[in-house]
Amino acid sequence: LVDDDPRRAAGSPFDTNPEGQYHTRMKKIEAIIKPFKLEEVKDALGEAGIEGMTVSEVKGFGRQKGHTEIYRGSEYTVDFLPKIKLELVIADDRADAAVQAIIGAAKTGKIGDGKIFVSNVEDAVRIRTGEKGASAV
């Protein structure tokens, strides 16, 4: 008996769910970037064929820490710097293209450029239709 279904081949972007149905593996990409880079990153992702994302204004710091400002003659330290958090869930085989697009558009070469986190996503459900998997995103 030969199983020639390409969805079961090594490296295939497909998995089976508990019901035995095939679905495309997905990745969640979270990127923390400088606010002024948002439009460039959005455009780069669009050029890579990646549409749809969630954008949040966040604050944080990494190695660059905060900075000192003077307000009404008093000096104070701003510990948390404004950043933008992008979140997108895409098919597994599109993750590398998305990461490269973000790096290409967000990188300035200076401290504070940000981070990208990539993780596996078990499932996604479109609330309106109940559609599941990669077709839901």
What is each of the regions a protein language model found here?
Residues 6, 13-137:
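Positively charged, small/polar-rich N-terminal and surface patches that mediate targeting and assembly
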